[in-house]
Amino acid sequence: MESHSLTLDEACAFLKISRPTATNWIRTGRLQATRKDPTKPKSPYLTTRQACIAALQSPLHTVQVSAGDDITEELKCHYSAEVKPGTPVSHCRTAKDLSSLLGQRTKGRPQSFMTS
C-alpha cells in the first residue's frame, strides 16, 4: 500500500471526523501522527493513510455498547438544593413560592386595611 503523507484536514476527510476529534485522537495515541517540523510546537500534523485505517480498527479505543448491560442508578440523598420535578417536595415548594409571590407585600409587617 502506498505510504504518502496526509495533512490533518485530509485525514479528517478520510476518517469522516472533525478536526478537534482528530487532534484528540493524536493526543491520546489512537491516531499516529508527527509534526511537519518537530522543533515547532504549532507545526501542522502529518499522518498516513495506514495510520488512519489503524485508528479506525483499533480495538483498544473502541467501546462495546449494549442496551441493557450494567444499568445502575445511584441513589442520591434528596436535599433541598436537589429535588426532582414532580415529587411531593417540589409541589410543596412550588405552592409556597407561588403563595409568597401572590401574597400582599407588606415590607415585613402586616398593614391594616381599616379606613376611618
Swiss-Prot record:
UniProt GO molecular function: DNA binding
Keyword DNA-binding: yes
InterPro entries membership: HTH_17
Pfam families linked to this entry: HTH_17
Disulfide cysteine pairs (residue numbers): none
Keywords: DNA recombination, DNA-binding, Viral genome excision
Keyword Metal-binding: no
GO BP terms in the entry: DNA recombination; provirus excision
Purpose of the protein: Part of the excision complex necessary for the excision of prophage from the host genome by site-specific recombination at the att site.
Protein name (Swiss-Prot/TrEMBL): Excisionase
Organism from which the protein derives: Salmonella phage P22
